[in-house]
Amino acid sequence: MSRVNKLHQWKERLRDRARTVSFGRFLWRRFLDDRLFQAAASLAYTTVFALVPLAIVVFGVLSAFPAFNEWKDALTDFIFNNFVPGAARSVQNYLNRSLEDLGKFTVAGMVALVASLLITLHSIEQTFNSIWRVAAARPKVTRFLIYWTVLTLGTMLAAASMAMAAYVFALPLFRTTEGQWLAEFAWRLAPMAVEFVCIVLIYRVVPQHVVRLRHALPGALLAVILMEIVKWGFGFYLGNFQTYQRIYGALSALPILLLWIYLSWVSVLLGASLASSMSAFRYQPEAMRLPPGFEIYGLLRLLGRFRQARVHGDGLDEDRILALEPMLTDTLMQELLCELKRIRLLRRDERGQWLLARDLDVVPLAELYENCQLRVPIEDRPLPCRDDAYGQAAAAALEQLRQPLRSVLAQPVGDLYTHLPGDPP
């Protein structure tokens, strides 16, 4: 599809009032279900304890490369000048002292610092997996390698970017009046650009889920806008009201820093929830919606798709599944895939595609019924895509399951107790 057609498609979607209202409701439900404010509070506390070990890793990486040694102080100043409130700037001195006393740390102390950092990173991954409705976490070794890669490469890229920026702005072009104005504008824009790029990378790398760039970008944009609003509001409050300084005195930096980290996490998580909602939302007309309680119908259709894919020696990715089964929502699909993986009926390959792990010819329906805990609906309701081959097979199996239940469940509840002895006097 060409870009012009895509833009036209998005324009038509925005004009569709029913779709827009449906997405708004869906987004609001996701915000409430994700409990982002509680998650941000938890991450804020763990982040405070991880600041020192994080700084140790970051500056340890820079120390390993002599070319970056001269940029350590510049990187620290850039972070604290642009991303930390002025009232909490004294934390930078405490952090520098901790780094200077690094050689005095005992083995137990270093283990505790590294453990606090790993706990924080694990909590962040769990929170993002929860937002993207991912039940299965990465293997521990893979998780550690990703953490280490992000920290080391991110640090090196940050230092290299600052070195490159310093080189570019030292060119004769930026010594003119116009060039100096452009350089000043670029430096003012740099913090927001850094925030935006980092948040996009976080959304794409941290969750155990394939996050499309077209979904990560709007989420990151929302997060950056919220962070800039928070930054402005924070500066206005601290500049006009001295309550924290009067109450806490010299210790005011700690609650201010904690509140700042909390509000920053709220911004990042709200952006993540938007990105997740954009990838999960599917507008379904009334005729294409799966009736409540008929999840087993969707499960049987899904297994039929996997059986057909196996015949052709192929697997199915999540986008393909949603395209083939339009009655499945992203949330229901994730739940079904996780359940089938848990009972080892499906597996995921290195490309992110789902494959059958066992032959369906030897899997009894009882195993699906017991393990997936899906009800067998008694009433007959219109089902989407019932007339195709997969719908006919799933509907026939569903009819066989509920046929003997109808007569049993039609009897009055009182008939169950007709053979009991009379009530005692």
Curated annotation (Swiss-Prot):
The chain crosses the membrane at residues 48-68, 105-125, 154-174, 182-202, 216-236, 250-270. The keyword Secreted does not apply. Keywords: Cell inner membrane, Cell membrane, Membrane, Transmembrane, Transmembrane helix. It is a multi-pass membrane protein. InterPro entries: UPF0761_bac, Virul_fac_BrkB. Its main location: membrane. It comes from the Bacteria. GO terms for cellular component: plasma membrane. It is found in: Cell inner membrane. Belongs to the UPF0761 family. This is UPF0761 membrane protein XCV0968.
